[in-house]
Design a protein with these regions (language model features):
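N-terminal "pre-motor" subdomain/linker immediately upstream of P-loop NTPase catalytic cores
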Residues: 83-178
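P-loop NTP-binding catalytic core
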Residues: 154-224, 230
């Protein structure tokens, strides 16, 4: 019973205690309320035991009718069981009376003090947040990022937030399933070996090029390196559309940090689906806001991977995320060129480094954009720090976009590590022929030649056949 009482919030316990006739409940703390309830239970148990012992003594006296004695003992046992049932029923009735009938569904954020809140709007604090008690968090092994579905208790005038009365599902599963899950950190990371096809009927040439030059696998840690106005946001939108079309079961989270509000609306309207979430923090928000949103998103993705699901995060951009951490992190006393604190890179690296393919099942793919040649030394330092951490790079060239060559992909500099695990033997051979052919060319010439060849073919299969047949670009 102790566990049952501890799983309830203090206000629910207080109401239960009042209904049982316990006095001075308003001044009691939760621990005192639990003890008082247990003492009341013990008192009732003693009374019940005393009654039963009296009946036994009566039955032990010599009687002319043993049959009647058996009947009396059976009746007393029935009465005892009925009393227990009545107690449980009264507790259930009390919980039903406290139930507001309002169902809450949102993401949990566990605070440092042990309690938590269910956030509903854009993963951030709001007026409609619901309080979750520390006992509920401990009992069900809840973590930040879990999606909680349950009913709230009737809110009193003194309370600022509604409180969670009971939980029905966690991440769409029964609460008993959640306690058996493994931690994200305990899963085994391996190289991406399942390909995410970006080419689809009616897809742009950009997706066909990326599918061959820089193939993306489940669990890829990719970086889209771009100068301003090179078309990185358009490319991200194309990738998102291709992923939702080719992998509808994959959970897609688009995280926009320090972006323009109109771009947020554009992406929200352009990419829709059951497994698509667009989370944002626009440039007019505080750096703390950017930091909090990004941490909630990565925790949400980890919880999904723990359930062996495939998740993809499209982050725009990791440079601005690092800038936000640079403004919020306590100064370490050291400074890199451009005014960047080395301690500010820890959390963005944790975010980017969370991408991995799991041997036990599930994967987390992160594609992040990085800005270069912005005129800020800090942006270049951030890019250099992240350069060796990814296993896929897609480089966009502003010179190509200025010449109106789209997509402005620098094919020479773009590529994927261990692409042999993702490409077919025919595709691998065609890519090698292409790379050898344009090795001595200028970037714009190589891209224009390849675009002409892509324009002459309907799909990548025809393109590969043409490259293998001609042996030259």
């Amino acid at each position: 019973m102790r566990e049952k009482y501890e799983s309830l919030s203090a206000t629910v316990l207080r109401d239960l205690a009042k209904s049982r006739g316990i006095k001075n409940t308003s001044t009691m703390k939760k621990a005192d309320l639990v003890e008082a309830m247990l003492a009341e239970d013990a008192k009732k148990e003693k009374e019940k035991a005393a009654k039963e012992s009296e009946k036994k003594q009566e039955q032990s006296a010599p009687s002319e009718k043993p049959e009647r004695k058996r009947a009396d003992s059976a009746e007393s046992a029935k009465e005892g069981s009925k009393e227990g049932e009545r107690e449980e029923a009264s507790q259930d009735d009390t919980i039903k009376n406290l139930d507001s009938g309002i169902t809450v569904n949102g993401i949990l954020e566990v605070m440092q003090d042990g309690f938590g809140f269910i956030r509903s709007d854009n993963y951030l604090p709001g007026e409609n947040d619901v309080y979750v008690s520390p006992s509920q968090i401990r009992k069900f092994n809840l973590k930040t990022g879990d999606i909680i579905c349950g009913n709230t208790r009737i809110k009193t005038q003194q309370e600022k937030f509604s409180a969670l009365l009971y939980i029905t599902t966690i991440n769409g599963y029964h609460p008993s399933v959640i306690q058996q899950r493994k931690n994200f950190e305990d899963l085994t990371p391996i190289f991406p070996n399942q390909r995410i096809r970006l080419e689809r009927p009616g897809s742009s040439v950009a997706m066909r090029i990326v599918d061959l030059i820089s193939p993306i696998g489940k669990g890829q840690r990719g970086m889209i390196v771009s100068q301003p106005k090179a078309g990185k946001t358009t490319l991200l939108k194309e990738i998102a559309k291709s992923v939702t079309a080719s992998n509808p079961d994959m959970h897609l989270i688009i995280l926009l940090i320090d972006e323009r509000p109109e771009e947020v609306t554009d992406i929200k309207e352009a990419i829709e689906g059951d497994n698509v979430e667009v989370i944002y923090s626009t440039f007019d928000e505080l750096p703390e806001h950017h930091k909090r949103v990004s941490e909630m998103v990565i925790e949400r993705a980890k919880r999904l991977v723990e359930h062996h699901k495939d998740v993809m995060i499209l982050l725009d951009s990791i440079t601005r995320l690092a800038r936000a951490y640079n403004l919020t992190v306590p100064p370490s006393g050291r400074t890199l060129s451009g005014g960047l604190d080395p301690a500010a890179l820890h959390m963005p690296k944790r975010f980017f480094g969370a991408a991995r393919n799991m041997r036990e099942g599930g994967s987390l793919t992160v594609l992040a954009t990085a800005l270069v040649d912005t005129g800020s030394k800090m942006d270049d330092v951030v890019f250099e720090e992240f350069k060796g951490t990814g296993n896929m790079e897609l480089v966009l060239d502003r010179k190509l976009s200025e010449k109106r060559v789209f997509p402005a992909i620098d094919i020479v500099k773009s590529g994927t590590r261990r692409e042999d695990l993702l490409l077919d033997p025919d595709e691998l051979e065609a890519v090698e022929i292409m790379r050898k052919a344009y090795n001595g060319m200028r970037a714009d010439e190589a891209v224009e030649n390849i675009l002409n060849m892509f324009a002459r073919t309907k799909n990548n299969k025809d393109y590969i056949a043409m490259v293998k047949k001609n042996r030259i670009i």
